[in-house]
Curated annotation (Swiss-Prot):
Oxidoreductase found in the keyword field: no
Comp. bias intervals (Polar residues): 38-48, 147-163
Protein name (Swiss-Prot/TrEMBL): Wee1-like protein kinase 2-C
BP terms from Gene Ontology: meiotic cell cycle; mitotic cell cycle; regulation of meiosis I
Coiled-coil regions listed: 490-516
Top-level taxonomy: Eukaryota, Metazoa, Chordata, Craniata, Vertebrata
Amino-acid positions noted as binding ATP in the UniProt annotation, renumbered to this chain: 219-227, 242
Main location: nucleus
Sample GO molecular function, one term: ATP binding
List of catalytic residues: 340 (proton acceptor)
Gene3D superfamilies: Phosphorylase Kinase, domain 1, Transferase(Phosphotransferase) domain 1
Region Disordered, annotated ranges: 1-86, 145-183
Broad enzyme group: transferase
Amino acid sequence: MRTAMSCGGGLVQRLDFSSSEEEDGLSNGINEAPQKGSPVSSWRTNNCPFPITPQRNERGLSPTQELSPSSDYSPDPSDKGAGGECPGTPLHYSTWKKLKLCDTPYTPKSLLYKTLPSPGSRVHCRGQRLLRFVAGTGAETEDPTLVNVNPFTPQSYRQTHFQPNGKRKERPEDDCSSDSQMKFTDKEHPSVFQSKRFVLRETNMESRYKTEFLEIEKIGAGEFGSVFKCVKRLDGCFYVIKRSKKPLAGSTDEQLALREVYAHAVLGHHPHVVRYYSAWAEDDHMIIQNEYCNGGSLQDLIMENNKKGQFVPEQELKEILLQVSMGLKYIHGSGLVHMDIKPSNIFICRKQTEVGEDESDGEDDVSSASVLYKIGDLGHVTSILNPQVEEGDSRFLANEILQEDYRQLPKADIFALGLTIALAAGAAPLPCNEDGWHHIRKGNLPHIPQPLTPAFLALLKLLVHPDPATRPPAASLAKNSVLRRCVGKAAELQKQLNVEKFKTAMLERELQAAKLAQDECLDLPPVSGFSCRGRKRLVGAKNARSLSFTCGGY
């Protein structure tokens, strides 16, 4: 179809297209610009008395505005034609559409082609969007190597699992995972995650604490922050949420908060260490989700006993010392030191167990089966090989730590554990300084009002020995015969075994006697008054018969 409009002898516009040419428009140069001197370049004349429409490139429309026929366009009076005589006015919709098809032939085929992704582009998968939080849009979310390095991770583990193995690992083109997934190549890779400042910052997300947890009550407070008892809305279980009191980002307490998270993550799960579930930052505050211990802390138990004038019995003291030493054995075996062992950092978990009518439970069984003592508050944890000691409570601090002698750091936990057991046994509160403090550092236990067995008392004195080399390590303390409940159980079981063996022997004797009696009944002796030859047995010997030899005079 060819159409031409004449205006004063000049050619105004020319439409030259056909339906058969639409399909070939894409391959024949969609973006080819008209050459100078072509008929298209002579669409405008200077002697046209009618208003003409300027080219789209002179308006500066965006591609979206150009493709939309319904886009509003208000002509600018300052815009004029090529000769400056006729202001530009919009064409009719049908004429505009024809011109558009002529200039850029967007056929259904070409439009479909433009909607397809380019080979180098990547389609982001939106699957499982409801299970994700929208992270912040800062620069820290774009760098895949912007992560913290856990200082408590063993060096051998880092070398084994963090370094690339030489093989190229890249995400395939059709993978729908997040863009933050790292790519390792042979030539370039991060040097085992150089520690970067991906620390406590406010994130552009809704409060996770308010969204996922229902706060029940405040159960504790300290220098670091407050502790709340909460119920998780999803699983309905109780957890402890520890939240810092003040913003930690950029403060001196920031590393202490991160140190506790690092230690929890490395230690994992142990029955005598408070379990760690998660940690995150909100408004520059650190929030840690830990296991809820329904028995409170050992400090709460000591205060309750002091009000009642009671003491923790010796058998329970042994149980506390045994279980805490097992927790310290696990911590020290992981290359870490707690550095803040005290009654307020030992927590009690009481199991809800029911005892049947036929079952009997002694004190030993009750303490071991229904009560667990766990070590918590890992804010002062440090590494044995690379110690960065942050002194804890001075009342439980060993003298060598005060002298900055870190050669036997695990023995500082043993010293603090001995004083903790002394407090649980009823000792007076420990002094913070002066003569009383130095008196204990010379190897003297504080006065314990209740009587203790000599073996247990000697063990407590050994724990606070002034020479750290003399104090027993946690591994040997957990196997000590004074503490191991299995020693008493073994003696009791051996006694029961001896009783059962005696009963079995008596039954065997009775069984043999019964067998002999049965054999005697079967083998009867011969009847008197009768002679038998050749040890023949008389028939009818057991029958009582009447024999008559009377003669009737016949």
